[in-house]
Amino acid sequence: NFPPDIGGIQSLMEGLSKSLAKHGAVKVFADEYLNFRNYDQSSSLDITRIKGFKIFRKFRKAFLVNEYLENNSVKGIFFDHWKSLEYVKSDYLTKFPNFCLIHSKEINHSLGGSLNSRMNKAFKKTKFIIANSKYTKDLAISMGLEKSKIHIINPGTNYPVKIEKEESLKAKVIFGSAFPRLITVARLDKRKSHQNILMTIKNLIPTYPDIKYVCIGDGDEKNNLESLRVQLGLEEQVVFLSRTD
């Protein structure tokens, strides 16, 4: 999970890597992705890409990480997912502080199932488990993870960036005199319940007739959400934008 792939975890790992780079050298192991060469060439990070079929990449990545840890001393290790941690040797992990991030979708595996067993076995090797919310921490505990290892760090954000005049004008066209103005930026998946936001907007119109909601993102649910917008008569109140917009 690393750019130029798009997503919340990808952005988080990029931000984490860039922040850590201010305090010393950072080595990144990540899967190949479309246009990765352009990204890597423009990045100041030392990135090793893993290619091949997905089923084999985790083994290749673990081999490279194990080899690196055998030959280098590091200050800390960060994993984006328990599957990235799974095949890294315990002997190396005991030598260095190590952290694994967790998000609810990636750990929601039924107790007693094979994925849950693999997950718990992997997490026994890590020193710190970083949950992005109290909800995720509680879910992790219910999935069998050690409570004492779990710490909550809510997702951060980059410092405000300069807004170009073109983007500022585009925002004024979209929002006009609307109030209140609501925005979400997320992948449009069923589990994120964007349909509930649309129904809430519908219920708020009597109180806030000038409300405007801008939903930024793409995903499997986009067509369904666009249809729901029409069914609820929210063509004026709800705008869908993709990343390219």
Regions found by a protein language model. Give the residues of each.
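Carbohydrate-associated surface elements
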Residues: 135, 156
